[in-house]
Amino acid sequence: RGDFIKLTIPFYSTNSEIGNPELPSISKLISVPTGSDIEIKILNKVSKKIILSEYNIKNQIFPHQPSISKSALAEEIKFHINDNVYKKDDFINEKIFKTEMLGKMREVQLARLIISPYSYNPVKQELEIITSLELEVKFVSEKNSNLNSSYYSPEFDHLYKKCINYLPPSPEDIITTYPTKYVIVSDPLFQSSLQPFIEWKTKKGFQIIEAYTNDPNVGTTTSSIKSYVQSLYNSATVNDPAPTYLLIVGDIAQIPSFSGNSGSHVSDLFYCEFDGNGDFYPEMYYGRFSGNTVDEIENQIEKTLTHEKYLFTDPNFLDDIVLVAGVDGAYAPTYGNGQINYATDNYFNIAHNLTIHNYLYGSGTPITSDMPQASASIISNVSEGTALANYTAHCGYNGWGDPSFNSSDVTTLQNYNEYGLVISNCCLPNKFDEPECFGEALLRVENKGAVGHIGASNNTYWDEDYWWSVGNTSNITANPTYSGTGLGAYDSWMHENGEHEDDWFITQAQILHAGNLAVTEAGGAEEYYWEIYHLMGDPSLMPYVG
């Protein structure tokens, strides 16, 4: 269809309809007081017009395209353009501001505030830009409620802080006032094996609630188990707050999973969604020790205890990081390399005394991901022990696609007592309704593999995985900057750029939630992402780096 131009601005995303000119907008999360309506009034506005031809710009603005699934073939990708819109001699714009009510997370009502300061006339090639805007946001009919004190958890403040207007409770005596409850739902087969894990978590200060499926109050179905967990949540009081963590112990034959609402996939999300009338924002952090046998569960328990107690024979492996932008001729040069470059530029580098095993696509590293030796080299790096291994591109349920690293390779690993977190931003690596997915293989293997695996139970998308890792931005580039993006999973985990302590996401489940919340802020396929991204491992574990 010819050439177009793109408007990209740091921190901006887009709110344009598919096929319409892609105009930058600002998208921020806000918290809405219980029972209130939102009123927004413009107090001051300054704008100006720009004639693009005066800047020697003759091409029209690029039409907004849907995010592309990482499972899509190049020949299947359709170009979207609304020709009638591009023929209009009039300014095309979204509302200057609008709010979208989202859902609740532990009784905090979330909404998205979108500000669209750009209008565009595609015939005259003119832009109208709001250069200064002052808004007044009021919450009308606000009701007083002490629900938050019953459901408040300091470990969720990290999520609420994503809302630009969130005010936390008084910090006085937070640890003693708001104890952290940890619920374990397990097949009774694993009750004895879980006791060392429970003893350790109790020593750490968690209040552990054990629930086994042979208890009629718990049961063996998704509905009965959810009803039990929800009863713990709903019965919360100021002096006995709602639980924060859920660990599911067993494969789907022992503890079944839900079917997703936004696609055909398994999802544990709904065990932890209670207060949003069917929304998709969890009220608890959750993870799964997936296993069918006592040995498979005990292997995960032992690795978790070894990691948390820092019982490594040689902890030097925690200095090693593996980062891979997998093979894709169309998207890897920008999306894949951009994600990995952001990680190495900001966090995982020599300046942090880390040893980086970096695999960019095409060029830029000693071994690029499209070289024949890449697969063997990556497997060797992991086999020698890594604090983090992160891959973005194509996968199947049994592992990374190209370069290949899959479940059969896990059995050959030699990283005994040297295992960390693996993050797979790709399709299906945590599809745990298969006999054994990649995440399950990494966790179940004895004394090697990984202590945690974050990945999806269905196909993922290029835009959303980029936002998940790097943060919300419309400027998807091979060299993103911290100043040009919102907070993604990397930033929230590593917290080295002056982020307030409340913005630190340091447990395995918090890292996952930070990525999903970046997708929510961007306005991407958020329901789908909250449903498909899962943690195999202990949700409260804080993975070491360095």
PLM features per residue range, with description:
Residues 1-546:
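Cysteine-dependent hydrolase recognition
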